[in-house]
């Protein structure tokens, strides 16, 4: 047995330590200050406790400033929360408490569920425990001991967890002072290293193991950060997100609603449907000349889905359709389509295709349905029925790179038109389980890697790029487009996916220049992804203050006095003739009341007309969110607003025509 271990440090230096030396020993050998700051170590990239003996490999000393420390801080905070709960409410059972995105939670079994009023009490107790600065220590228990100890404590959920751990796997128990829990670890050195930048966020119900047949538990969510400034910033973003919640704004703006009889499907109101159609019309114009817009059936025989493979691996997420009545002559099983690609392949296959016709680009604003658990549904962001701005390009292998670049240019241009300038494009490469031979993947990944470099180069570095190893679809590599909104949240929207699978499954081919049947390359492409979700993102990004060209109601003409009503109607008609969507408000109400009311529904422009404006044939323009009013002539107002209400793609075409004439 070796009497020493060899450790390689980030600077490349190599040191030897006695066998049994811990991470803390290594940190202390470098400096006392580093040992004081250290919270954990990483050996060959795997984070471990400071108290754990080190082994040969590459070592890193992790401090609270390290990004990896954040997960440890949150993990430890979850344990401290559990201890606080059991100190305050003895007899409460602790179940599972993982770190999640932006925080942590713990599920508790308690006779009476927790309420939001309990959270400040728990936080206060957590601060006491953190101040005690008790060390985290690890023990390895036998299965029998763990079951006996937890059973004696009345922790039946822990006993069940112990039973679920595979035979031969260590049962780790972490102590913080006298309190302990079953946990894989790792943890920091002591509770004091958590700090005070934490907050408990909310309580919710949760079934044990996520199964509705099991008992209902109470889940407490929390978050924690290394620094108070980071916590404050996160809470500020949450507050902003709440103000921008598209579900609330959708109600206030009278855009849409959901109801129990149609879970996960949208009831579009007049104004909401107008925005939706504005989005569709814009996307349709962007496809002109390059794409054939098609429409594949909503309901198809399951045999098609068996051929595509969806029936085997996606059936539980599909809505099956049965024929009404027992005496029908068609007893086949049908399903609502969860995606558009199999239908588009049928359209491509209808009739012989020559290489001279490629690329063939088929686009559809296709209504699809996918089963989502009711607990996962979230306004427009997560629904069961939605519209995909889907397209499938059938091309030759040689055309693949050019098509991917063409798609990229379109996607980035669309995002820019809606005000999204920070976009990240990432290439997802081959997963472990995949179809197609390595030569196909090598070729596709090589082409897409070059495309990725071109994307970054052409943008002058404005568009960030990256690689997601192993994250590709099983049928081919893909690009993922992630945009950043006004408050810094990231939304993955667009995708470009190369597919080796479906053309082969469906026997799609074209006739090449040698009169041979050749399988085409199929590229799946979506820009918005789900049109409903993209609209939800837009509403939240703009906090309901939609650009004039997107807004469902662009102008309200409001009069100060009934003497100006005639002129107000003339103003409204002139604006309508210029192509704007206009309503009038001639009610016998004070003008400030009218302005407040229309501001709640997020009308972008209110034109105020009084006796003076009628005499001068002028208007006062008041913008949403501004107290100021701008006076101008009616003709100036019409010219200015009609220009602003023109979609950006239409403006570009006009400018291009003018430049051509000039």
UniProtKB/Swiss-Prot annotation:
Keywords: Aminoacyl-tRNA synthetase, ATP-binding, Cytoplasm, Ligase, Metal-binding, Nucleotide-binding, Protein biosynthesis, RNA-binding, tRNA-binding, Zinc. It is found in: Cytoplasm. CDD domains: TGS_ThrRS, ThrRS_anticodon, ThrRS_core. Belongs to the class-II aminoacyl-tRNA synthetase family. NCBIfam families: thrS. Its cofactor is Zn(2+). Binds 1 zinc ion per subunit. Homodimer. GO terms for biological process: threonyl-tRNA aminoacylation. GO terms for cellular component: cytosol. Signal peptide: none annotated. It comes from Rhizobium rhizogenes (strain K84 / ATCC BAA-868). This is Threonine--tRNA ligase. It catalyses: tRNA(Thr) + L-threonine + ATP = L-threonyl-tRNA(Thr) + AMP + diphosphate + H(+). InterPro entries: aa-tRNA-synt_IIb, aa-tRNA-synth_II, aa-tRNA-synth_II/BPL/LPL, Anticodon-bd, Anticodon-bd_dom_sf, Beta-grasp_dom_sf, TGS, TGS-like. Zn(2+) binds at residues 341, 392, 524. Residues 1-64 form the TGS domain. Its EC number is 6.1.1.3. Catalyzes the attachment of threonine to tRNA(Thr) in a two-step reaction: L-threonine is first activated by ATP to form Thr-AMP and then transferred to the acceptor end of tRNA(Thr). Also edits incorrectly charged L-seryl-tRNA(Thr). Its main location: cytoplasm. It holds the Pfam family TGS. Residues 245-547 are annotated as: Catalytic. One of its GO terms (molecular function) is tRNA binding.
């Amino acid at each position: 047995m070796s009497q020493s271990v060899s450790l390689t440090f980030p600077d490349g230096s190599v040191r030897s330590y006695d066998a049994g030396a811990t991470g803390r020993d290594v940190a202390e050998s470098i400096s006392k200050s580093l040992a004081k700051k250290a919270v954990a170590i990483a050996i060959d990239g795997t984070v471990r406790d400071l108290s754990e003996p080190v082994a040969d490999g590459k070592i890193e000393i992790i401090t609270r400033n390290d990004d990896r420390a954040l997960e440890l801080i949150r993990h430890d905070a979850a344990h401290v929360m559990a201890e606080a709960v059991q100190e305050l409410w003895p007899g409460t059972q602790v179940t599972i408490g993982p770190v999640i995105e932006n925080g942590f939670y713990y599920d508790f079994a308690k006779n009476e569920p927790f309420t939001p009023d309990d959270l400040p009490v728990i936080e206060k107790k957590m601060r006491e425990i953190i101040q005690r600065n008790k060390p985290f220590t690890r023990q390895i228990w036998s299965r029998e001991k763990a079951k006996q100890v937890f059973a004696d404590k009345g922790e039946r959920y822990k006993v069940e967890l112990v039973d679920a751990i595979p035979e031969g796997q260590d049962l780790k128990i972490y102590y913080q002072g006298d309190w302990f829990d079953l946990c894989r670890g790792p943890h920091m050195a002591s509770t004091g290293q958590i700090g005070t930048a934490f907050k408990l966020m909310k309580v919710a119900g949760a079934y044990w193991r996520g199964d509705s047949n099991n008992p209902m538990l109470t889940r407490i969510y929390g978050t924690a950060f290394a620094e108070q400034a980071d916590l404050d910033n996160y809470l500020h973003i949450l507050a902003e997100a709440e103000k921008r919640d598209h579900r609330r704004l959708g109600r206030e703006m009278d855009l849409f609603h959901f109801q129990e009889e149609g879970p996960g499907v949208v009831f579009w109101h007049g104004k909401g449907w107008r925005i939706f159609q504005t989005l569709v019309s814009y996307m349709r114009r962007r496809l002109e000349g390059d794409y054939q817009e098609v429409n594949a059936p909503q309901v198809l025989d399951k045999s098609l889905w068996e051929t595509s493979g969806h029936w085997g691996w996606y059936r539980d997420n599909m809505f099956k359709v049965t024929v009404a009545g027992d005496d029908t002559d068609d007893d086949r099983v049908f399903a609502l389509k969860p995606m558009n690609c199999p239908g588009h392949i049928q359209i491509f296959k209808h009739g012989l295709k020559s290489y001279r016709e490629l690329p063939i680009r088929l686009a559809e604003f296709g209504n699809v349905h996918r089963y989502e658990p009711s607990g996962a549904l979230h306004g427009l962001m997560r629904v069961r029925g939605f519209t995909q701005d889907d397209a499938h390009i059938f091309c030759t292998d040689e055309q693949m790179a050019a098509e991917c670049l063409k798609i990229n240019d379109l996607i980035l241009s669309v995002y820019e038109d809606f005000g999204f300038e920070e976009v990240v494009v990432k290439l997802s490469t081959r997963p472990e389980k995949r179809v197609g031979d390595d030569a196909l993947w090598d070729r596709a990944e090589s082409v897409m890697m070059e495309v990725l470099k071109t994307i970054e180069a052409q943008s002058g570095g404005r568009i960030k790029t990256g690689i997601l190893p192993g994250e590709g679809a099983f049928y081919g590599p893909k690009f993922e487009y992630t945009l950043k909104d006004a408050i810094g949240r990231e939304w993955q929207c667009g995708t470009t996916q190369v597919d080796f699978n479906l053309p082969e499954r469906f026997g799609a081919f074209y006739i090449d220049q040698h009169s041979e049947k050749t399988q085409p390359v199929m590229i799946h492409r979506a820009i918005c992804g789900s049109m409903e979700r993209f609209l939800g993102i837009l509403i939240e990004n703009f906090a309901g203050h939609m650009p004039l060209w997107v807004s469902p109601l662009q102008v309200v003409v409001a009069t100060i006095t009934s003497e100006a009503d005639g002129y107000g109607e003339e103003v409204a008609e002139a604006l309508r003739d210029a192509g704007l969507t206009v309503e009038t408000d001639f009610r016998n109400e004070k003008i400030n009341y009218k302005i407040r009311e229309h501001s709640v529904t997020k009308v972008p422009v209110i034109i105020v007309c009084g006796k003076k404006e009628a005499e001068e044939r002028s208007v006062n323009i008041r913008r949403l969110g501004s107290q100021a009013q701008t006076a101008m002539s009616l003709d100036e107002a019409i010219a200015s607003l009609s220009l602003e209400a023109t979609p950006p793609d239409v403006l570009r075409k006009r400018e291009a025509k003018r430049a051509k004439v000039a």
